[in-house]
Regions:
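Soluble catalytic domains of enzymes that build or remodel membrane lipids, polysaccharides, and related
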Residues: 5-193
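Active-site metal-binding motif and surrounding structural segment of the metallo-beta-lactamase
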Residues: 1-2
């Protein structure tokens, strides 16, 4: 089990720790804080031990990408929690550069699963460029139609994604309302080929 959170405050981290998250997901890495943080930091939690945990996977002009490698029965998968800026007029350049930076992972050797608020839909050329010929969007692979995540109460946009290598297969994929969040959670069962 791997949980990726975005826009996490230090107060929320403390509350999660006090509530006993470590009893279920004892391994974690929080992204380093930067002036680019988009509402808070990105965090990864895992039930399995993490290897090569990093506070920032790749230089990106948005919230740092927390990342770690997890061994799935001999197959090592590199997970990342991502949150580029939204493509508002004042952030357009940062948003494009953030997605372009993430697209550079196509040239790395690891097997990747990137999870989070990409602030992008299939209508955005920058998101399609990020996927390139290597990565898939879990919603696309599941073949079940759109999984709207924003806004949480009456979602009209599919901006949260699980982006992964073609060597990872998606089983179940669903959205869940989480009280207090402005996005719905995106839950997936993944299998490593």
């Amino acid at each position: 089990e791997v949980l990726a959170l975005q826009e996490v405050s230090w107060d929320l981290l403390n509350r999660l720790n006090s509530a006993g998250i470590a009893n279920y997901l004892p391994y974690s890495v929080a992204a380093q804080q930067t002036w680019h943080d988009n509402g808070g930091v990105n965090v990864l939690y895992s039930a399995a031990p993490m290897e090569n945990a990093k506070q920032n996977l790749i230089p990106v002009e948005s919230s740092s990408v927390s990342a770690a490698t997890i061994d799935f029965g001999g197959s090592k998968v590199r997970f990342g929690s991502v949150h580029p800026f939204s493509p508002r007029p004042r952030n357009q350049g940062l948003w494009n550069r953030s997605l372009d930076s993430l697209a550079q992972l196509q040239h790395y050797d690891n097997l990747y699963v990137l999870m989070g608020d990409f602030n992008s839909t299939w209508d955005h050329a920058s998101f399609r460029y990020l996927l390139g010929s290597r990565f898939l969007d879990s919603g696309q692979q599941a073949g079940e139609g759109l999984h709207m995540t924003y806004p949480a109460m009456m979602p009209i946009a599919e901006i949260d994604h699980i982006v992964h290598d073609k060597g990872v297969n998606v089983g179940d994929l669903e959205t869940k309302y989480i009280a207090g969040s402005d996005h719905r959670a995106l839950l997936a069962t993944l299998e490593v080929a």
